């Protein structure tokens, strides 16, 4: 599978396979022998910004497809966490299933784009976060499943060892750093999140 679809062909494929998800977001689906991709497509007035964002998204999705093989199927899906006039926040879920395994494995990847430039913004753009901050917040009731369900302190199975690059912003302007399954809690808790909104930089959001 090619890593990047040329811009014109990419647009034509999307026109045939996309379905609306939000005012400026479309959902595209691709399937192959060993993969299924469900990913967002950004629509905007500036073609360069649109291409920058969509190329980054598709590159991520295509890596998942390229990992698929006989007896190992892969998938890629997403959730739109927030969109406003300036920012676009997604959670991506690349995963794979080995034939015969008890369950598949997947990761949580959080990305925030600047809609005025197309640039993917680091966590440090919105908040200054340290490992000590994450441990403190996790232990003081700011630990959740990514969907907002609180995780009790007694269910914690690990402590943050580093500040992840992955994060998202929700519709309320809250900032969450995310961790893939098993890192901080059991597999059933899925992708977990620590609310770092209190560390946010004033006036950025």
Predicted segments — roles?
Residues 7-8, 100:
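Composition-driven detection of intrinsically disordered, low-complexity segments
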Residues 8-15:
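Bacterial N-terminal signal peptides
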Residues 1-4:
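Positively charged n-region of N-terminal signal peptides that target proteins for export
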Residues 19-205:
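Compositionally biased intrinsically disordered regions enriched in Thr/Gly
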